[in-house]
Regions:
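Transmembrane beta-strand segments that form the barrel wall of outer-membrane beta-barrel proteins
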Residues: 35-37, 61-71, 78-99, 104-106, ...
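Glycine-rich phosphate-binding "P-loop"
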Residues: 41-44, 62-78, 179-189
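Structural signature of outer-membrane beta-barrel domains
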Residues: 14, 18-20, 70-72, 98-100, ...
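Detector for outer-membrane/organellar transmembrane beta-barrel domains
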Residues: 109-199
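Outer membrane beta-barrel
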Residues: 1-62
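Generic domain-boundary/flexible-linker signal
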Residues: 22-24, 64, 130, 164
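Residues that define the transmembrane beta-barrel architecture of outer-membrane proteins
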Residues: 5, 45-49, 74-78, 85-87, ...
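Outer-membrane beta-barrel channels and translocator barrels
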Residues: 6-9, 18, 58-60, 86-89, ...
Length: 199
């Protein structure tokens, strides 16, 4: 890969991870490098052969362009992301093209009375008649207690997910199984919780 930088620009070409996600578990905004949170053996997230251009107009805002070409043009991914900070929250807005779909989304990260509050959502508009539209959204709350206990609660909605999942759906959660961002998880409604304590 190659990279060029100046005071307000970074341009990188080659294998890289373009990380547009905010949440810990599910990242609807991450259209370039989706991953499986439950693949515990995979230590490093995958990358894309892509062009990434970042522009920093000021210390609160970032504008990004990403393009990952594919051998079949229709399977390429391209997008534009704008990040800013307002009211002590980080916000982002994106629009792009994902494998024969147009997509638009938003994300945020902040806190409510000391409780971390994050979220992401994307909508997909098919360009082919046989394609399906879809909305995916995830939100999460996390908190670190004064005695060292960390707790997190996260919810995901996937419009293309199974409302009544069977064994086949669970099989797609195994190692090396990565869902795309349009159909991010096998189920329509998913709740995830975890807790950790530092000894």
């Amino acid at each position: 890969w190659g990279q060029w930088e100046s005071s307000k620009w970074i341009v990188r070409l080659g294998r890289q991870r373009i990380n547009w996600g905010i949440n810990t578990v599910w990242n609807p905004n991450d259209i370039f490098n989706q991953y499986n949170y439950f693949d515990f053996d995979y230590e490093e997230r995958p990358g894309s052969d892509a062009l990434r251009v970042q522009y920093f107009p000021n210390f609160k805002s970032t504008l990004e362009l990403g393009f990952a070409p594919a051998k079949q043009t229709g399977q390429s991914v391209a997008g534009m992301l704008y990040k800013t900070n307002r009211w002590q929250y980080d916000f982002q807005f994106l629009a792009g093209y994902y494998k024969e779909d147009l997509t638009a989304g938003t994300g945020w990260a902040g806190s409510i009375k000391g409780i971390g509050f994050k979220g992401e959502a994307n909508y997909y508009f098919p360009l082919q008649e046989e394609g399906e539209s879809n909305f995916t959204g995830s939100t999460a709350l996390d908190y670190l207690f004064h005695f060292g206990l960390y707790a997190q609660l996260s919810y995901l909605y996937n419009g293309l997910g199974a409302a009544e999942p069977g064994l086949f759906n669970f099989a797609s959660l195994g190692a090396n199984q990565v869902q795309g961002p349009k159909n991010i998880f096998p189920f329509k409604h998913t709740l995830f919780t975890q807790a950790g304590y530092t000894i």
